[in-house]
Each structure stands twice: as structure tokens, then as C-alpha cells.
Amino acid sequence: HGLGLLVLMDVVHSHAADNARDGLGEVRFGWDGPGCGYFPPGPAGHHPQWGSRVFDYGAWEVRRFLLSNLRWWLEEFRFDGFRFDGVTSMLYHHHGAGRGFSGNYAEYFSDETNEEAVTYLMLANKLLHELVPSAVSVAEDVSGMPALGRPVEEGGLGFDYRLGMAVPDKWIELLKDRPDEDWGMEELMLTLCNRRYTERTVAYCESHDQSIVGDQTIAFRLMGPAMYDGMSALEGASVEVERGLALHKCIRLLTMCLGGEAYLTFMGNEFGHPEWVDFPREGNGWSHDKCRRMWSLADTPHLRYKFLLAFEEAMHALDDLYAFLPSPHQLVSAVDEEAKLLVVERGPLVLVFNFHTTEDAEGLRVGCGLPGKYRVALDTDAFDFGGKGRVSHDAEHFTEPGGFNERPCSMQVYVPARCAVAFAREDD
């Protein structure tokens, strides 16, 4: 708090250990019948996919227990809010297992909906925001439950944000299965924009799910073993490293500007940490070798990791200056599959992404909402970010009337291949 940081706790109220010896499995409240323990009797009290127990959210003592748990963390440790784990599992009796959600309301409101769990989550968010009005609650939900992120007073579940979990899955799918020349621009745009209007989403490229043992970080998928012997800034970059650095920056900026109303960075992603996380366990001989983050990589002057960190800092500085993340104005004015271009308006900014592997976009006409003079506010190709410095920050881009791509004004810009540029309008 002294550093100006909010601290959220990952709270797990979606299930509990299947442990009768030192857990809650056999605890009774002093009477027999419904609501006499923490878990429903029979199959309803068990989570078959996770091998754990499911709380009886309709029981008064269970609600008292879980709500008092939230209050204890808030008051005793001064947490600023919670990221609720496994919300999809709570919302439905089928726990979301093997289900695909298309957006049909019948998938969300049926006999499969766990109304008692829904009620508990509403109570939890109401309590949280009454105790600490500035508190933040985030839901880990993959189903897209309507009104999850609307206030309880409106009939919603009261969460401030939901996690945009489809976005990292899409990036990993593209990186694993397709070369970047085959990436679909409309496919990317639809994935990033596929969220409920007026419900805020946390966008992110990767999290612990993509960085644990058995998986790979985005940086490693882009650059592979070159991350170990090709990251020296004292010599020219290889083709693999040059491509990896360029796409790593574009992926983060596109996710931040188009994927939601908040942005999450997993520890180390901001500078392209190469290795996964693996905690000591029997399967690895209780090794601490990968139980770490090598923060020194970003602090070493002769390594290229510093460029990725500098770009992360610049992205957040851009949001501090132009407040584009909380802005309701988000518009994609151009999607060009052949040229691999996306033109995005977010807040007051116009951002152009060129994912083409070889072709620079020179003299590219892009639409914009307001007339005037625009300058470069951020570009991924700057020397400070390990780029080639091909985009001039001194150039003035004047708009022309007449309309373009259903926007009232347009201007001409230059965006190199595998680069992204953000343009900001200068006040008169």
C-alpha cells in the first residue's frame, strides 16, 4: 500500500479438500438433515473433475462461514479485494465440465444453474463493497454468464471485472498451430472484442495457466532456445529473436487496447521471462530449480529483456496519459486479411497494427473520428524497445475530410511490418 499498489487475494470458495481427517468433510453443525454440514450429501457434494468437495451454498452456516472468511481477510490483512477462483464451477451443477457456451440464454438460466451459489456470490459482492467501497472483485468465469459484472442492485452478481480467459487461449492456439503469416485478423479481432457490453473485463496474454510445467510462455514459443543464447544486445539479433521481440510487443499492445477495460501481466511476462514455473513436488524430486522468476534478466544492461520491460512501462504510461483502458470508446475501423492490418480506435487514440511478415504499410490511409493533427504516441519499433527506429515521432499527420472506412476523417501513416503504432491527436 505504501507503494500505491492494490493487493487482491485469489480466494477459493468454489471447492474444498476431500479430507475428513483434518478438513471439513465430516464436520456437523449439531443437527441432522439438510444443511447439517458444509457439503451436500451424495454426488452433489463432490466435484468429480477436481476430486474435491462442493460447498452447500444454500446452508446458512456455510454462508456465514464463507462470508466471514472474506471479512476476515479484508479486516485482518487489509486486502483490497479478491479474485474468485472457479466461478464457472460454482454457477452450474454440471460445473461447466465439457460444456461449450454459445451465448444462448438457456445455457445460463436453467435447472442446471446453481441458484444457491449465485445467491452466495451476490451476497459476497454486496458484503465486500459495503465493508470496503473501493474494493475490487474479479470473477474467473469461462461461460460468459450474463450480468456477472453488473451491480447487485440491478440484479447482477456484483463483480467489478471478469477475466477474459478466451484471449490467452487464442494466442497460445495461434502460436502453437500456425505461423504468423496465417493468423486471421478478423479471428483475432472477434476474440478480443467478444465480451459483454457494460461488463468490464480483465485482458491478458498469459497467466500461470500458460506458464506452469508442461506449457510454455509466449516468449519461449516465439523464440525457443534462442532465449538462452541469442538475447545479447551487444550483437545483432537473429531472425528468431527479431521476430519474437516484435510480435511479443504487438501481442501485448493489441491485447491491452482491444481486449478489455483492465490489463493483467503475469509475473515475468512484462520482460519475456523464458522459463515456466514449477513448484517443488514429488514428480520433480522436490526441485526448486524452476520455482523462481529471474528478475535479474530485465536488469542486465547487455540483455534484450530490458527492451521488453521498457515497452511494458511505456504501455502503462500511455494509459496513464490518455486513459484509454477505462474509455467506453472502442472501435475497429479496418480489418485487412491480405495486408494483415488492424486499425483500432480506443479512447482518444488511433492504433494501427501491421502483422504482415515482410510488407511495410507506407502511405496507409486510416480513418479517425476527429479532425486535426496527429503525432506518434507510441510505436513498437522504437530503439528504446529493441526496434529499428523506422517510425518518426516528429512527423505531423494532418487529417483530411471526406470520410474513410465509415469514419468522418482520415490520415496517412507509416507502419513497418510486425509493428504497431499509436497516434494521438494534438490539441489546438
Annotate each predicted stretch with a short phrase.
Residues 391-428:
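C-terminal beta-strand-rich structural cap/linker in extracellular carbohydrate-active enzymes
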Residues 1-6, 60-65, 115-122, 242-249, ...:
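Aromatic- and glycine-enriched glycan-recognition loops and surfaces
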Residues 1-113, 396, 413:
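Substrate-binding/active-site clefts of carbohydrate-active enzymes
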Residues 9, 70, 74, 121-125, ...:
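Generic structural signal for well-ordered alpha-helices
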Residues 371-404:
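Trp/Gly-enriched beta-strand surface patches
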Residues 294, 300-322:
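Catalytic cores of secreted or luminal carbohydrate-active enzymes
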Residues 78-80, 95-284, 288-291, 320, ...:
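Conserved alpha/beta catalytic core and glycan-binding cleft of carbohydrate-active enzymes
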